[in-house]
Amino acid sequence: YIRSYIPYRQFALRNYYQWGMPSNKAWDKLVLEGHNTNPNWKLTFEAHPAEMLFDLEKDPDELHDLSGTPEYAEILSKMRQALSDHIRVTGDLGFFLPTSRTGHILYDKVRKEKYPLNELYTLVETAGTATTASLSMLEEAITNPLSEMRFWGVVGYAKLAREKQISSCPQALLALLQDSNPYI
């Protein structure tokens, strides 16, 4: 089971030093200009679904996503819930922006300030799979005083816009262009 909380980003992480090398520039050119003959080569350049499920015994290279296959729906649901439970039990801090980590120990800060981690986790899980039914949650998030909430609200809007589920940009979202946090 693979979960992507920002599914509209390309599949591969870009190491900009490595990607600046002549061989990687040639690879970019080959794939992006449509000259490759292997569709798997293009996978790292494309966005991907929020969730993917693979049978590692039958498909060790993880090429055949089973997340949309009805006979795997129950397994997908169990994996989704197991991950959701895990991030809550462990108090996962991986959804915080880099600017949230300066000048203090984040672990101590969220406990001392009684940070609403469960609200953050719910928003994060919703943002990557957002639908128009999520708009009220996203609207509330982008006006939240907590920068992480605003960031993940923006992620939800970006997902909806990319999929053409929304056709206009709310004023509160436009206002975030002037946000003091550069990650938003």
Give the role of each language-model region:
Residues 1-68, 74, 106:
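C-terminal, low-complexity/hydrophilic appendages and adjacent surface loops
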Residues 45, 77-78, 82-90, 95-141:
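Extracellular/periplasmic ectodomains of large secreted or surface enzymes and adhesion receptors
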Residues 55, 59, 144, 179-181:
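Acidic active-site catalytic centers that drive phospho-/nucleotidyl reactions
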Residues 71-74, 164-166:
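Structural helix-adjacent loops and short alpha-helical linkers that scaffold large soluble proteins
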Residues 73, 85-86, 159-160:
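A short structural micro-motif
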Residues 114-132, 148-164, 175, 183-184:
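Structural detector for internal amphipathic alpha-helices that build alpha-solenoid repeat scaffolds
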